[in-house]
Amino acid sequence: MKALKELLSELIFTCERGNLEKEVTAVVYDSRKIVEGCLFVCIKGANFDGHQAAAEAAEKKAAAIIVSQEVELPKQSETTLIRVEDTRYALAFVSAAWFDHPAKKLTTIGITGTKGKTTTTYLVKSILENAGRKVGLVGTIEIIIGDTHIHAVNTTPESYLLQEYFAKMVESGCDTVVMEVSSQALMLHRTQGFVFDFGIFTNLEPDHIGPNEHGSFEEYAHCKSLLFQQCRIGIANCDDVHWQLITKEHTCSLETYGMSKKADLRAQNLQFTNRQGHLGIAFDVTGLMNFHAEIAMPGRFSVYNALTAIAICRHFKVSEADICKALLAAKVKGRIEMVKVSNEFTLMIDYAHNTMALKSLLTTLKEYEHGRLVCVFGCGGNRSRERRFEMGEVSGNLADFTIITSDNPRFEEPEAIIEDIITGMKKTDGVYISIPDRKEAIAYAIDHGQPGDIIVLAGKGHEDYQEIKGVKYPMDERDLIADILKERGISF
């Protein structure tokens, strides 16, 4: 239990009814979880406004209710009514207080940007743990607390859940947390209630703009920029054309990284490395640090991811040797993830599931000396048809051979989605085949692999399911590959 006054101590509010001399048994923002003695925070969601449940909360003898608009409570109710300007903002501070401000007991690292967040969080975790720290992680794929892995629903959880995860990290002995910070999370105040020790900006491209996300690119950029008003040390990629827009209202100390001479920490002399089953890139780190490094992931964007991690970890006094060792060993599920299937060609799994990501990935891989570039992909159902045309055209232009298959068809027919992709493919001279069953498509790619080929399984990445007509059926591409190899008597 916590005193209501204590939970409200960092908020500006008006007590419209009742008194503050109460004990609270729980903090609740889901109307289905209202219990006697709780503090119910009315949140406006996509499908339901918690203010509609205010009277119900009072009837169930909630200790207090936080609202941002007028509500009617039963006249006889003794529930305290608190009014604030923004209930999501209030929830963040109340949650931090409820869990005894766990972020103050951790070194907190928040990474925002259109691309690179997931990979960079794992690189930072790898480097810091290699140097002896215990690091929690919050991101798109999962939440990691000690040995516990929790499947992620959102890139950045709701503020109450985030504070609960922080508390569990402290309890498990973590001293640091690295997390992805989405623009939606910043817009919805999920990361309020504490100050990041480090805030990092990777890059910005038009994405997440639409009816259910951001109304415009300007709004998207503004939301990203909020991180630099909520951290002590800001670190920004100054090669990105938008970096000054993102940092112009910063309230933190600021340093930069990139490949240009103006960066405080720089990567130079890039060298592509291509060994059997391995695509990577080596580079020299100069400026704030000076050493030679290599990352076991291909492409210039991998250098940016590595450089971001180095820019963060240098503040932890990690040795150059520990950084180099961790970068070579780092592996991120579903992010340019190499899977050994042959001694003659390379196969990888990647989450590239939209036009921008697929184009970036295939363009990167074309920079390496190789045989054919083979792309196996599909598109999700009940999503933009335009994306299907575009991705078909991208693969047709960049891949030497495309195998079009099913992704998450959802409530559409896989064959109809494939036909849309083929429409885009036919705008090019690209060679393709369509195989709707994803396992059969992967098997075809492996069976027809040629010496020097690079085969990319794009779109599913870290996902371990296939969504068909409202049901998520188990399907992990690593398991599919293992089954295919076993059926052929191949082992590594």
Regions of interest found by a model, annotated:
Residues 8, 91-238, 242-250, 307, ...:
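Phosphate-binding loop of NTP-binding sites
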Residues 24, 37, 62, 78-79, ...:
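Short, well-ordered alpha-helix to beta-strand connector turns
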Residues 45-47, 183-184, 205-208, 240-241, ...:
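Short glycine-rich anion-binding loops that position phosphate/pyrophosphate groups of nucleotides
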Residues 14, 76-85, 150-153, 251-258:
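Active-site regions of enzymes building and remodeling cell-envelope glycoconjugates
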Residues 63-69, 234-238, 376-377, 400-408:
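Short internal beta-strands
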Residues 10, 58, 71-77, 172, ...:
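Acidic, Mg2+-coordinating active-site environments of NTP-dependent enzymes
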Residues 1-15, 36-39, 251, 288, ...:
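ATP-dependent carboxylate-amine ligase
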